[in-house]
Amino acid sequence: MWVRQVPWSFTWAVLQLSWQSGWLLEVPNGPWRSLTFYPAWLTVSEGANATFTCSLSNWSEDLMLNWNRLSPSNQTEKQAAFCNGLSQPVQDARFQIIQLPNRHDFHMNILDTRRNDSGIYLCGAISLHPKAKIEESPGAELVVTERILETSTRYPSPSPKPEGRFQGMVIGIMSALVGIPVLLLLAWALAVFCSTSMSEARGAGSKDDTLKEEPSAAPVPSVAYEELDFQGREKTPELPTACVHTEYATIVFTEGLGASAMGRRGSADGLQGPRPPRHEDGHCSWPL
């Protein structure tokens, strides 16, 4: 009932004020009321990447996002811009703006930072419709320190070159310790084999030479046995001769004659009396 009693003139006045001040229409489209840029302090080493985040409560395609840097004279220098869904570096391609999937946050990256990148950075939003308006976030400072060399305090490990040299030295020593005995063993086996082969060859050669030289070195005397004449005659069997029958006559003398005769016979045949018959005379009987 009370609403019906509100005069239309008052309602119209409120709408006009809201339109002029942007309380109802321009505020939803104005991102600068919730524009943030963090972290407020960022320290990185030279060569690393630095990342800031710019957040907007409401984003529309009519807005343009700028990434600025304050100069020593407190003037803003544009580094990159994001418009129509694209990152547009101004001078240095190391400055990039990436829109996150939630479409309200933007990562502003500096790749491969340098010492002269240190300074104060901020982001700014520009609204072109219905009126051109610019709003900037508070500044955040970036400090780029000297390049940090990798040390072995946290993860102690020898440098690659000494390690490689040490490993090479160990491998060389082990190879020498293993290779030298193997070479000596092979040399010894080869020497034994060669000496055995040479001795066998010499033994076989000496045997062959002995067999070849034996007929001439120790000749066997050969004697030609010839039969002598007298040996031939002795060996020739004589045929038994025919027995010659000899007749003897006995002469009887007187005593004187007999004595002389006997004396003569004795002188002829000896003192032993008449000679007995010999075997060579055959089977001759004494003469009658």
Curated annotation (Swiss-Prot):
Disruption phenotype: Mice grow and develop normally but exhibit splenomegaly, selective augmentation of IgG3 antibody response to a T-independent type II antigen, and enhanced proliferative responses of B-cells and myeloid cells by anti-IgM and granulocyte colony-stimulating factor stimulation. Mice are prone to development of autoimmune diseases. In a C57BL/6J background, mice spontaneously develop lupus-like autoimmune phenotypes, characterized by proliferative arthritis and glomerulonephritis with predominant IgG3 deposition. The chain crosses the membrane at residues 170-190. The keyword Membrane applies. The modification Phosphothreonine is found at T236. The keyword Transmembrane applies. A motif (ITIM motif) lies at residues 223-228. Residues 191-288 are cytoplasmic. GO terms for molecular function: signaling receptor activity. Residues 25-169 are extracellular. Residues 31-139 form the Ig-like V-type domain. Ubiquitinated at Lys-235 by the SCF(FBXO38) complex, leading to its proteasomal degradation. Ubiquitinated via 'Lys-48'-linked polyubiquitin chains. Deubiquitinated and thus stabilized by USP5. Tyrosine phosphorylated at Tyr-225 (within ITIM motif) and Tyr-248 (ITSM motif) upon ligand binding. Phosphorylation at Tyr-248 promotes the recruitment of the protein tyrosine phosphatase PTPN11/SHP-2 that mediates dephosphorylation of key TCR proximal signaling molecules, such as ZAP70, PRKCQ/PKCtheta and CD247/CD3zeta. Phosphorylation at Thr-236 promotes the recruitment of the deubiquitinase USP5. It comes from the Eukaryota. Residues 277-288 have a biased composition (Basic and acidic residues). Residues 263-288 are annotated as: Disordered. PANTHER family: PROGRAMMED CELL DEATH PROTEIN 1. This is Programmed cell death protein 1. It comes from Mus musculus (Mouse).
